[in-house]
């Protein structure tokens, strides 16, 4: 008889630390110092003493998550959502909103103040309701082989597992109204395994819904969807490998208080927080101190969210966008709103654009709203235009600091800045910053 030796698998030791929480960073993580190293700890608040499981241990910093509280902060809140700490959407429901906002303002102040000796005028935060603010949600769909039912919900944090949901505390009421109705609808589908995901967007003229499916949709299911769209007055879109088709309703749009309407397609980027979009746009235009003598360049303009409102205040406006379809939509939006002093061009702003016709025009003011990667390449060329004011809307403090340093090296100074609390209960830090010539 042959004896086979099977080595025992080594169990991985779970490393733990005990920490006194000193501060809160803008992402909602508790900050501790242990033997000179900074630790960022999930689900921890200042003045708490916690036992933590180490998630990441680097030379200069570490990342951990609370296992047990020895001392809890009296300011800690009970999360409103039953799925908090499992769903990947919110990170800060246990943190008072005033504490969240103070941490974000402190982070912006510390980062920008290091770039120049001149004082910066930090303005009051642009903020709104902390709940029911999201006008767009994406819902994953999964056929559960055990129950033979389709499940709808959000992805669990750091996994592909699905958490079924019937409501979301940060979604707009029009979206929450539909969630239980959608669950009931999906149970009637003849081929639920073919369904991929659902997107809901609360436009100003109703809710738009996109259903992604992977194989041909049965006619009975298509009829079911059409009846649902008619009943709930939805704008209904279907997406397959062949593309997106709208099968019911009008084109979605949102509207500014001055009457400007921006039409968009269901998958187009729009600001998720509808209540803060117009205050953000108005702040940008006010800080630029626009007049009928100004020629303004708007970079990363999308479908004209900033460009159309500013064009009504200036002599001329030019919008630059990398995606051709968005350039077309921006031009169509300008035409619909009868705004004639505006032009749109397609350009990859991460590539040289000095040969393009718009790059040789004269602009005395510039506005840019880049993606998270920032605008480093574009700024090196744009500074040669010597605009008197540059307004930068940022969704990433790291690239904002990098790009602000470029502008400061070209002779600009930071005049004023403010946080935009676009995503309460999350670690996202949006901001708006005005640069002027020294």
UniProtKB/Swiss-Prot annotation:
CDD domains: AdoMet_MTases (cd02440). PROSITE patterns: SAM_MT_RNA_M5U (PS51687), TRAM (PS50926), TRMA_1 (PS01230), TRMA_2 (PS01231). GO terms for molecular function: 4 iron, 4 sulfur cluster binding; iron ion binding; RNA binding; rRNA (uridine-C5-)-methyltransferase activity. GO terms for biological process: rRNA base methylation. Its EC number is 2.1.1.190. Gene3D superfamilies: 2.40.50.1070, Nucleic acid-binding proteins, Vaccinia Virus protein VP39. Residues 10-68 form the TRAM domain. It catalyses: uridine(1939) in 23S rRNA + S-adenosyl-L-methionine = 5-methyluridine(1939) in 23S rRNA + S-adenosyl-L-homocysteine + H(+). SUPFAM superfamilies: Nucleic acid-binding proteins (SSF50249), S-adenosyl-L-methionine-dependent methyltransferases (SSF53335). [4Fe-4S] cluster binds at residues 81, 87, 90, 168. S-adenosyl-L-methionine binds at residues 271, 300, 305, 321, 348, 369. Coiled coil: none annotated. Catalyzes the formation of 5-methyl-uridine at position 1939 (m5U1939) in 23S rRNA. This is 23S rRNA (uracil(1939)-C(5))-methyltransferase RlmD. The lineage of its organism: Bacteria, Pseudomonadati, Pseudomonadota, Gammaproteobacteria, Pasteurellales. The gene is rlmD.
């Amino acid at each position: 008889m042959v004896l086979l030796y099977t080595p025992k698998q080594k169990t991985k030791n779970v490393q733990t630390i005990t920490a006194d929480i000193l501060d809160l960073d803008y992402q909602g993580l508790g900050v501790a110092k242990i033997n000179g190293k900074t630790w960022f700890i999930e689900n921890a608040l200042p003045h708490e003493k916690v036992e933590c499981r180490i998630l990441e241990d680097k030379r200069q910093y570490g990342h951990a998550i609370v296992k047990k509280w020895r001392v809890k902060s009296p300011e800690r809140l009970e999360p409103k959502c039953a799925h908090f700490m499992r769903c990947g959407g919110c990170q800060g429901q246990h943190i008072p909103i005033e504490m969240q906002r103070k941490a974000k303002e402190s982070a912006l102040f510390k980062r920008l103040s290091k770039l120049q000796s001149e004082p910066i005028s930090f303005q009051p935060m642009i903020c709104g309701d902390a709940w029911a603010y999201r006008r767009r949600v994406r819902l994953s769909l999964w056929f559960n082989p055990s129950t033979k039912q389709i499940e709808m919900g959000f992805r669990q944090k750091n996994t592909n597992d699905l958490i079924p949901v019937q409501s979301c505390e940060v979604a707009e009421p029009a979206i929450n109204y539909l969630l239980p109705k959608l669950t009931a609808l999906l149970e009637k589908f003849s081929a639920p395994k073919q369904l991929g995901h659902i997107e809901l967007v609360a436009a100003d003229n109703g809710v738009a819904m996109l259903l992604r499916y992977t194989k041909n949709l049965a006619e009975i299911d298509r009829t079911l969807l059409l009846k649902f769209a008619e009943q709930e007055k939805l704008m209904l879109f279907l997406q397959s490998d062949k593309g997106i088709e709208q099968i019911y309703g009008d084109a979605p749009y949102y509207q500014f208080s001055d009457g400007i309407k921006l039409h968009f397609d269901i998958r187009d980027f729009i600001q998720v927080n509808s209540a803060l979009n117009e205050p953000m746009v108005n702040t940008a235009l006010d800080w630029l101190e626009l007049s009928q003598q100004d020629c303004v360049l708007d970079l990363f303009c999308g479908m004209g969210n900033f460009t159309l409102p500013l064009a009504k205040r200036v002599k001329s406006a030019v919008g630059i966008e990398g995606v051709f379809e968005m350039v077309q939509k921006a031009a169509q939006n300008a035409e619909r709103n009868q705004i004639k002093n505006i032009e749109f061009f397609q350009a990859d702003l991460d590539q040289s654009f000095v040969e393009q016709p718009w790059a040789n025009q004269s602009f005395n003011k510039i506005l840019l709203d880049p993606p998270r990667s920032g605008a480093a390449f574009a700024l090196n060329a744009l500074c040669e235009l010597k605009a008197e004011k540059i307004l930068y809307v940022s969704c990433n403090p790291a690239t904002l600091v990098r790009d602000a340093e470029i502008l400061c090296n070209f002779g600009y100074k930071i005049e004023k800045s403010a946080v935009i609390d676009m995503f309460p209960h999350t670690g996202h830090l949006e901001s708006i910053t005005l640069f002027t010539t020294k």
